[in-house]
């Protein structure tokens, strides 16, 4: 069963008022004159979309509580008895959020009889309110029974264990500790560790209490949890005296590393320097090296290099890390001799160290940027061969493989086959299969080429190389060739067989999860409804179905895109026919279609290319603002926008103009047209220039005599730009198949 059909199967059981045709029939195309965002289909949720409906009234009350707004919710419930239980649930949750524990418990009791599918929510909030009211421990524990037996598993179960532990802490702290340890994986953090530490302290197991308070302090640099843990540690230190277990050097080092990762450089340096009081050893020397390297993160490589050269670690791994730091400093200072000297020393004395791998890659990347193949190819080869299990070993191997292919060297085919066999699950395997196909075509082995392209067209249909493969399969000599058995065997031996449709028959858990989320949303508790679906996506094994439900409720197209990307990271692996059209429209939205098509037509551009670029730049968020201060749908810098606004006759330009979809589309398409003209009509070069700048593209084009655009794209040294070009072209292809005539 496909996702398209499985979603239809869910509907009758979940939502009797929604007809199946809404889900699986013909969806309306994007608005022909669509100058505004897409709106959610009215049959998606039972909650009235009017601000005067229950969901709207509850939302307003929770956002800004007042007696008048509470009265509005109560009045709605009185006038609509069929929704009174939902209103009671909402009022109970709102009262809990406001700290009105008696009212929360009272409202939740009223809601309980008619909300069995979400009894765990009622149980958790009621128990939590009664705990705050200091009710009898037995009564609090009894309230939690529906959470313990919830099917499917509940997103509030972790918080419920904390409520139970707090209820038990005073009278039976040891039982509270056992409870939390038994369900540790479910506990929300850092509250879980804080509560466990509290219970250990109540049980007079002070050393264990210190361990978990220290864990909270180490993992949380700021916030209430960190402050509570710090205060508790001070109290326990005073109480325990010499028996207080001091944090281990590795714990202190990890906290210092977190401070560095957070770019809190002064605090990080202080934390590293504080390890000078520990016994000589690896952690102490690592702290010295990392403190010395901090100026490197502040763009002062010379100062960092001077500090690192002054150190003389005795521990091999600390010395290896110091040498890597020196290589980094030399690269920043463009001192290739010193960089390679550090790499050479690492090879002589620390051949198996991860710091040598890092130095090899640092140096290789440095030379790759300048197209110095005689330097970077041996470095990548060493990284791939000497560190074959490294997380990015496939990338290092691919750099060598593609170089050999691009320059038509004799071992290119063997390296491409090796890429597939060694790293079949890596994304570069698709690149290798494509270029094996191109090699086969060059040798007029169209039978092998057909096999390679057919695999890409099936397994990578919505990816860049799948798109290219479909074009190759359209050639008569490839299409008519008999498939090569040896090529099939090569792919099969690497595990690259034809993809099987995903198991998407909706489970009972998925169906119930959607029903629960709709009840919560109908009560105006959209945050809980969203959390229910996200939890189910992680726990139930059918993230696509649940992500679709959540994306349908997104208030704007860009939010739906983000939901689906996050919850279904492999969404592009689905075939078009395995999901309803609406799923793809949410993933590849086309709001402002009329404006976009008009702007594209004005500048003689493919509207689907423009749409593909916008999806990659801003996901169709008209208010998008990048860290580089690029604005709007097409992410235009104000200085560039001002220049092209004049060309478009847009007067009184300001940065705010770029947040207007109509103006941004006119300016953005004008920029694209100008860049396309400057690049002799090459879409690939234009996209690379749009992302990385025109000067770089001119340099990259001089690196080789590219036989096809894909070779240029694969040669782009910046991963971000290379991925960007491929993604925009892939997006455009999907838009064309989805919305084209």
Positions of predicted regions on the chain:
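Short solvent-exposed coil/turn linkers within tandem alpha-helical repeat scaffolds
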Residues: 44, 76-84, 108-120, 147-159, ...
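N-terminal leader/linker segments that initiate helical-solenoid repeat arrays
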Residues: 30-93, 97-99, 121, 228-230, ...
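Residue-level detector of the short coil/turn that links helix A to helix B
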Residues: 64, 99, 134-135, 171-172, ...
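Catalytic glycan-binding domains that act on GlcNAc-containing polysaccharides
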Residues: 349, 354, 358-361, 370-375, ...
């Amino acid at each position: 069963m496909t996702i398209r059909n499985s979603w239809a199967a869910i509907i009758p059981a979940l939502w009797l008022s929604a007809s199946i045709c809404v889900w699986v029939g013909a969806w309306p195309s994007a608005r022909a004159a669509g100058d505004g965002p897409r709106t959610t289909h009215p049959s998606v949720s039972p909650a009235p979309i009017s601000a005067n409906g229950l969901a709207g009234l509850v939302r307003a009350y929770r956002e800004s509580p007042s007696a008048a707004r509470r009265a509005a919710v109560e009045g709605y419930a009185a006038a609509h008895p069929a929704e009174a239980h939902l209103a009671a649930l909402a009022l109970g949750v709102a009262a809990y959020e406001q700290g009105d524990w008696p009212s929360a418990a009272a409202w939740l009791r009223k809601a309980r009889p008619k909300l069995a599918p979400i009894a765990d929510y009622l149980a958790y909030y009621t128990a939590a309110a009664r705990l705050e009211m200091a009710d009898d421990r037995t009564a609090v524990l009894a309230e939690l029974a529906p959470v313990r037996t919830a099917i499917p598993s509940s997103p509030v179960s972790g918080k419920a264990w904390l409520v139970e532990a707090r209820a038990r802490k005073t009278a039976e702290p040891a039982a509270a500790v056992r409870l939390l340890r038994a369900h540790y994986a479910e506990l929300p953090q850092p509250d879980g560790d804080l509560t466990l530490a509290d219970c250990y302290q109540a049980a007079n197991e002070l050393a264990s209490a210190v361990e978990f308070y220290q864990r909270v302090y180490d993992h949380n640099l700021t916030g209430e949890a960190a402050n509570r843990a710090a205060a508790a540690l001070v109290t326990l230190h005073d109480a325990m005296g010499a028996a207080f277990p001091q944090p281990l050097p590795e714990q202190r080092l990890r906290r210092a590393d977190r401070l560095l990762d957070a770019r809190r450089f002064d605090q990080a340096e202080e934390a590293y320097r504080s390890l000078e009081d520990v016994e000589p050893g690896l952690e102490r020397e690592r702290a010295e090296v990392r403190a010395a390297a901090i100026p490197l993160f502040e763009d002062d490589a010379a100062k960092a290099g001077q500090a690192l050269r002054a150190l003389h670690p005795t521990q091999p791994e600390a010395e290896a890390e110091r040498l890597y730091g020196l290589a980094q400093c030399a690269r920043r200072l463009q001192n290739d001799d010193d960089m390679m000297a550090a790499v050479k020393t690492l090879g002589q004395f620390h051949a198996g160290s991860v710091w040598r791998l890092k130095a090899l890659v640092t140096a290789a990347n440095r030379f790759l940027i300048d197209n110095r193949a005689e330097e970077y190819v041996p470095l990548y080869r060493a990284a791939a061969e000497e560190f074959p299990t490294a997380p990015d070993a496939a990338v290092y191997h691919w750099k060598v493989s593609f170089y050999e292919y691009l320059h038509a060297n004799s071992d290119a085919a063997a390296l491409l086959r090796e890429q597939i066999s060694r790293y079949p699950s890596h994304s570069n395997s698709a690149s290798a299969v494509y270029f094996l196909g191109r090699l086969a075509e060059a040798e007029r082995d169209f039978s092998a080429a057909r096999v390679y392209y057919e695999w890409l067209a099936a397994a990578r249909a919505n990816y860049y190389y799948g798109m290219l493969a479909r074009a190759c399969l359209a050639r008569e000599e490839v299409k008519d060739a008999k498939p090569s058995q040896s090529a099939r065997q090569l792919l099969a031996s690497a595990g690259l067989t034809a993809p099987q449709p995903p198991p998407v028959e909706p489970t009972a858990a998925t169906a119930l999860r959607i029903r629960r989320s709709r009840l919560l949303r109908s009560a105006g508790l959209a945050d809980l409804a969203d959390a229910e679906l996200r939890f189910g996506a992680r726990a139930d094994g059918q993230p696509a179905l649940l992500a679709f439900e959540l994306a349908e409720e997104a208030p704007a197209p860009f939010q739906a895109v983000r939901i689906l990307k996050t919850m279904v990271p492999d969404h592009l692996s689905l075939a078009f026919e395995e999901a309803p059209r609406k799923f793809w429209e949410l993933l590849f939205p086309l709001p402002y279609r009329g404006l976009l098509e008009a702007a594209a037509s004005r500048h003689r551009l493919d509207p689907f290319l423009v749409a593909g670029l916008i999806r990659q730049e801003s996901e169709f968020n008209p208010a998008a603002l990048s860290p580089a201060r690029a604005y709007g749908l097409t992410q235009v810098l104000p200085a560039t926008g001002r220049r092209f606004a004049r060309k478009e006759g847009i007067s009184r330009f300001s940065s705010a103009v770029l947040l207007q979809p109509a103006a941004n589309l006119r300016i953005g398409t004008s920029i694209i047209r100008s860049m396309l003209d400057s690049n002799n009509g090459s879409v690939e070069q234009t996209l690379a220039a749009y992302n990385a700048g025109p000067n770089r593209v001119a340099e990259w084009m001089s690196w080789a005599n590219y036989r096809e655009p894909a070779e240029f794209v694969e040669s782009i040294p910046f991963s971000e730009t290379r991925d960007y070009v491929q993604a925009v072209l892939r997006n455009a292809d999907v838009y064309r198949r989805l919305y084209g005539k």
